[in-house]
């Protein structure tokens, strides 16, 4: 069962909660997991992974990587007004489905093209 997530890959989001210094930071969504309702944001929630060498030629060590964040802890930043906002989905008269900013009513992007 997949859950609807209000952000897409490539969106700019702001972190609402986090480890003190990370709250309020902006980043780009790298990956969305609808099954778990989580997102991976560039430069946020960095964890250290201890990795063993898998082959004779690969080097092991400690790797920094982004960990998933629950989608409820991020908010989309509107590309038009630049403010964190909730997302409204709307179907226009011509059948086009869009994502819209609730603060400035600007179109964020088109989800589905108009039916011909």
Curated annotation (Swiss-Prot):
- Choose one Gene Ontology CC annotation of this protein and give it: ribonucleoprotein complex
What are the record keywords, sorted?
A: Ribonucleoprotein, Ribosomal protein, RNA-binding, rRNA-binding
Instruction: Return one GO MF term.
Output: structural constituent of ribosome
Q: Which InterPro entries match?
A: Rib_uL2_dom2, Ribosomal_uL24, Ribosomal_uL24_KOW, Translation_prot_SH3-like_sf
- Matching Gene3D superfamilies: 2.30.30.30
Keyword Ribosomal protein among UniProt keywords: yes
Q: Which domain of life is it from?
A: Bacteria
GO BP, sorted A to Z: translation
PANTHER family, alphabetically? MITOCHONDRIAL RIBOSOMAL PROTEIN L24 (PTHR12903)
- Family assignment? Belongs to the universal ribosomal protein uL24 family.
Q: What interactions and quaternary structure are annotated?
A: Part of the 50S ribosomal subunit.
What is its biological role?
Answer: One of two assembly initiator proteins, it binds directly to the 5'-end of the 23S rRNA, where it nucleates assembly of the 50S subunit. One of the proteins that surrounds the polypeptide exit tunnel on the outside of the subunit.
| This protein's name | Large ribosomal subunit protein uL24
Q: Which organism does this record belong to?
A: Acetivibrio thermocellus (strain ATCC 27405 / DSM 1237 / JCM 9322 / NBRC 103400 / NCIMB 10682 / NRRL B-4536 / VPI 7372)
The beginning of the lineage is:
Bacteria, Bacillati, Bacillota, Clostridia, Eubacteriales
Name of the gene encoding the protein in the UniProt record = rplX
């Amino acid at each position: 069962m997949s859950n609807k997530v209000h952000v897409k890959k490539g969106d700019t989001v702001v972190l609402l909660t986090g480890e003190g210094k990370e709250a309020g930071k902006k980043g780009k969504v790298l990956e969305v997991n609808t099954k778990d309702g989580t997102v991976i944001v560039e430069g946020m929630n960095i964890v250290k992974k201890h990795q063993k060498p898998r082959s004779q030629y690969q080097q092991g060590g400690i790797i920094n990587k982004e960990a998933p964040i629950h989608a409820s802890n991020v908010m989309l930043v509107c590309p038009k007004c630049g403010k964190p906002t909730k997302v409204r989905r709307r179907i226009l008269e011509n059948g086009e489905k869009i994502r819209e900013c609730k603060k400035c009513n600007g179109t964020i992007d088109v989800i589905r093209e108009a039916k011909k």
